[in-house]
Amino acid sequence: MEDREMSTKPESISSRPPEIPDNDWKISLYDPGDNDDCPRACFLPCDMFAHTRYRLDLIKQGRDPLDLTDYKDFNPTCWKFFGLCTGGFCIGSGIYTGRETTRIRQKYGIKGTAGDDMTRGIFCQPCSLIRNDLEIRQREGMKQEADLPPPRPLGEDYQPIFAIKPDGYKSEPRMTTPRGILKPIASPEISSPPDGQPALREVHFHEPGQGNAPNVAASYPAEGGHVSQSSFSPRTEGGPSTVNQRRSREGTLTPIEEADNQAGEERNKSTTLGPAMNTFQRTTSPPVMHVTTSDAPIQAPTPTRDHDRYGNGRGPDTDRLEVPVQSNTPARKSRFSEEFDAPSADEMFSKIPDAAPSSTLDAPPRLPQLPGAFDTPAMPPATVPAGSSDVPSQLPQLPGAFPSSSHSETPNMKPSALGQLTALRDVANQSPKVVTVEEAETSIAETIQDEADEAQVGDRPHDNSQDPQLDTLPPRDTRHRLNIDEQLAFLPPQAEAHDSGTNTVVPLPDQPEAHGPHMDAKVALAAARIKDHPIESDPRINSPKPISIRNHEFTEDKRLAVPRSDSPFKPGIHLDQRVPTPPALVRPHNRLEDRQTATPSPSADRENRNLAADVRTASPGLGSRRGGLMGGRPHSLRHDSRVGTPKHLENVHDLAADVRAPTGPVTPLAKSPEPRSPPPKRLAAASPALSASSISIGTRAHQLLEHFLEGNRKAAERENGNKS
């Protein structure tokens, strides 16, 4: 068992990538990450940790760790981390985060120690969680970019894997020419004729039908001169031969170079001796020999943009040699295609009669207006209206009427009228020839001219002096003065003011004085009197005199109520005789002198009441003049129905002797608030003369007295309650 553990341990250690010394974290510990990474790491660290663990599991399974499509929230890893956060006070989750950091560091060979990972996981747990997730995302993204195949170059033999063409699609021909068809044409050799012998002219051409045959040179005697020395020789650096050879090797031709070659050849083919054929033109017809038959003097070809681009050097050989040369070789026509022949500019204008023989090249062209549209060159020639001085002519063959032979497999159809008109104007502006148009187009031009010459309403300048509307308003002074105000001119001479007091109309004198309040028509007559308005004389004002007129004294004010309070009166307030002084504030109230108060209830100060002084509470005595307690007859408790003391035969209570007994109703179960010694017992012997009938009469009288006293007591209590 130990051998198996020892054998598996080196394998696990060797499977980990070694630590690279310079391999450090690509993400800083304090990198905030994306917008939601920082809040998730602080408030939902379990979710951030679960995402990182899920990415590591995808790497272990060989899947894309950046694809979280199958990730499920609230997985077991998330709940486990949540339990460590809440139960271990973040120490357990910090250790868990440190172990995850160590795992990531060992996987990518990042330098560091496990102790540092644990420390950062405990004390910087959100930062460690963000760095772990960002590190995996960045390293795996860089790895995927490095594993992509390199882009395939788009060469001549490249074919796309998928080529979807819609119905009716017609592909454009490729801008290439098969190798072997283009052959460089050598320039004529420079030769000097010997004395007395005619100059020989060498012409290099291709035989028709033998496109791949070598060049054949033919010598023809030159009459009346010798061949001009051309600057475009094979020995010239950057000349056409070098360019042609390079193009032959490449087999391509740009549209700009093709257009430049065509323009240069069209300008020089009538006066230039040499290879004027455009060998790079895509055509199915075999090339022909081109030799000029013009009587014009021989001159060197005019350098084109191709020459300026590839051979910028100009030497003394570029000077023109004006030597007439005659030749019987048929003229060559440049062929754009098999169906159409494009005439040159000289051929087009040679067919147009000169309407102005006296004009020169420097004179501006005289052309009528050319509105409307033109037809194709295949239409009948245009005619001039009857009576016109213009000579009938035929429309020239316009270059715009022919198709291009470089970008389309089919010839172009009928060109637009605007294109023909533009081309015709461009051609006409280069020559003093006159081109006419049809009658309908001439009438349109005349109509446009008439409309342009028609007088308009607003053509003449506007003169303010001729405007009759400006004479109605007289000139007025712009300055505003109150004494001559124009707005008051409509008022009658005698302005009137309305007096609201007398309700009469009083005329105001018209005085040439300064404008003031007393002259204003809107001010009442009362305002004209410059005097103070007394408040006393105004019967419409009922307000009292203001404080500024007289001083207000409280002693004279009979309407001020004196506030009543228990505090002593303030000085000055007692002068008001309408407020009586309450007697309660003058002397204290003695309850003993109040005859209306019956036996009061016990007060807080436990005031002792002398029952002997209260003659109304005494019981009438029997057999005595004065009766009651004053007569000296003892009071028996057994006769008192309101006293809750247990009736004992041997206990005779004497009220006269008990001067400290508390007053008030006593309940049968009431107890004395303070324990005190019982009064001395006095044994009173019954009178021998007292019979049973006398005792019953006395008891009845005592009950009646108690009944009356009870009514008085209740009435006194009601009065005391109302007063309080």
Swiss-Prot record:
InterPro entries recorded: PLAC_motif_containing
Biased composition (Polar residues): 227-245, 270-296, 403-413
Designated name of the protein: Uncharacterized protein NCU10291
Ranges of compositional bias, category Low complexity: 682-691
Gene source species: Neurospora crassa (strain ATCC 24698 / 74-OR23-1A / CBS 708.71 / DSM 1257 / FGSC 987)
Matching Pfam families: PLAC8
Record lineage: Eukaryota, Fungi, Dikarya, Ascomycota, Pezizomycotina
Region (Disordered): 1-23, 166-477, 496-517, 532-691
Superkingdom, natural source: Eukaryota
Residue stretches of biased makeup (Basic and acidic residues): 304-322, 550-560, 637-657
